[in-house]
Structures are given as structure tokens and as C-alpha cells.
């Protein structure tokens, strides 16, 4: 009965941890959505201003400029990296425990994940379909397969258990 009680307590702790992680990500997601909606509204206002004061050609030039979407995507990735590492501060170390020593992964800078680490972070979060990972990271499915295949090949689990190991970190 003690064994059962310990297992039950461990399960409760795991559920509590998962609940806190979900709450954290939900709060971050909501904040990001509100920020994005405010930026879109500001962008719309600047387009209206451009049409009114500078003409349609100025507004068309603004619409053709990729800077708004590109900047937002970079900000989204930076926010994701920061949030993920805030919740899982030892993620990179845990990943590297499952990689061949000569193929350990590094963060390109403090609080920033590389593409490889982002792919693994998404797998850790339960997003395992390559098509969904590709969509989130704005990459082709082929590119994601290539990255993932390379990661798996250089892991200590070059079989199909690699994703399961990462998901359970």
C-alpha cells in the first residue's frame, strides 16, 4: 500500500507540474496575442494615415515591405525561446545527455534556441507531427525532416524512441 501511495503522490506531482506549465504557456500566449492585435491595429492606422496623407502608392509600398511580418516572426521566436527556457531551464543540458558527445547542441546566444533545439522543444511540448512543426517554425516539411533525421542520427537513441525520450525530458 505504501508503494501505491508513493506512486499516486508522484502522479499528482507530475499532474501539478504539467498544469503549471500549461498555465504558464497559456498566459504567455494570451499576452502575445494581445500584443500582436495591438501591433496590427497600429499598422492599420499607419496604412490609413499613409493613404490619407501620402496617397495609395505609399500604402501599397508599406504593404509590399516584408519588414512587419518578418519582425513579428522573429519576435515570436524570441518570445517562445525565452518562455520555453523559463519553464524548462535545463532543457539543453537534458537534451545533450541524449546526444553523442561530439554532437551536443549549443544555444547560439543566451536565452535563444537554435532551430534544432526549437524542433526538440516543440516535440517536448507534444507537437510531434513534422507538418505542424514546419508550420510553427515557418519552414518546409522537408527541412524539418532533414533537421530531425540529423538530430536522431547523432543521438544516443538513433531508433524510433528518440522522440519519446525528448517528449519525456
Question: Predicted regions span which residues?
Answer:
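Cytosolic nucleotide-binding catalytic cores of signal-transduction proteins
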Residues: 68-169
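Membrane-proximal linker segments that couple transmembrane helices to downstream signaling/catalytic modules
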Residues: 3-115
Amino acid at each position: 500500500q505504501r508503494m501505491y501511495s508513493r506512486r499516486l503522490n508522484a502522479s499528482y506531482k507530475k499532474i501539478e507540474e504539467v498544469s503549471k506549465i500549461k498555465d504558464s504557456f497559456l498566459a504567455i500566449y494570451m499576452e502575445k496575442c494581445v500584443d500582436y492585435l495591438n501591433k496590427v491595429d497600429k499598422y492599420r492606422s499607419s496604412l490609413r494615415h499613409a493613404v490619407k496623407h501620402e496617397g495609395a502608392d505609399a500604402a501599397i509600398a508599406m504593404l509590399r515591405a516584408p519588414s512587419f511580418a518578418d519582425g513579428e516572426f522573429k519576435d515570436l521566436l524570441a518570445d517562445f525561446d525565452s518562455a520555453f527556457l523559463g519553464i524548462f531551464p535545463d532543457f539543453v543540458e537534458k537534451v545533450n545527455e541524449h546526444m553523442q558527445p561530439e554532437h551536443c547542441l549549443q544555444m547560439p546566444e543566451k536565452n535563444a534556441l537554435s532551430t534544432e533545439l526549437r524542433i526538440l522543444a516543440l516535440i517536448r511540448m507534444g507537437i510531434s507531427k513534422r507538418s505542424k512543426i514546419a508550420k510553427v517554425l515557418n519552414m518546409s516539411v522537408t527541412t524539418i525532416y532533414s533537421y530531425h533525421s540529423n538530430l536522431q542520427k547523432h543521438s544516443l537513441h538513433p531508433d524510433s524512441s528518440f522522440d519519446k525520450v525528448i517528449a519525456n525530458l
